[in-house]
Curated annotation (Swiss-Prot):
Signal peptide as annotated in the record: 1-24
Family annotation (InterPro entries): Thionin, Thionin-like_sf
Subcellular location: Secreted
Protein name: Thionin-2.2
Chief localization: secreted
Coiled-coil residue spans: none
Source lineage: Eukaryota, Viridiplantae, Streptophyta, Embryophyta, Tracheophyta
Organ and tissue specificity: Low basal expression in seedlings. Also detected in rosette leaves.
Family: Belongs to the plant thionin (TC 1.C.44) family.
Function: Thionins are small plant proteins which are toxic to animal cells. They seem to exert their toxic effect at the level of the cell membrane. Their precise function is not known.
């Protein structure tokens, strides 16, 4: 039980810290490259590697450079929903997922599952329920 309390505390702290991070804009040449970037960030969590693998670029500008029209933060409803679910899981749950690669304990697996459920709940409007379940 003590382990679950620690994991839950880390999860809540990660959710809070993720809210205060400054987001850079990731620009990709195609939607497929954008998807490759998202999947890579979920599994590897090394932005440098994922940018190379996906051919995407990290920029601090408000507009993507020519040829990189598929930005991660575009305002279409589908993109926002996709970014929310995948971006939240990669940025907030990334550390837990990395730990899970080295430690396959049930407590850690449950923490990763709770984290991804919390992200999904936040993205679909149930942020209060997500915080309560964590």
């Amino acid at each position: 039980m003590e382990g679950k309390t620690v994991i839950s505390s880390l999860l809540i702290m990660s959710l809070v810290l993720a809210q205060i991070q400054v987001e850079a804009k990731i620009c990709c040449p195609t939607k497929d490259d954008r998807s490759v970037y998202f999947v890579c960030m979920l599994s590897v969590s090394s932005q440098f590697y994922c940018l190379l693998k996906s051919k995407c670029k990290n920029t601090s500008q408000t507009i993507c450079p020519p040829g990189y029209t598929n930005d991660i933060l575009e305002n279409s409803g589908d993109a926002v929903n996709e970014y929310c679910k995948l971006g939240c899981a990669s940025s907030v749950c990334g550390a837990l997922t990395t730990l899970q690669n080295f430690d396959t304990s049930k407590v850690l697996s449950e923490a990763v599952e709770q984290c991804t459920k919390a992200c999904s709940s936040v993205c679909t409007g149930g942020s209060t329920a997500a915080v309560k379940s964590a």
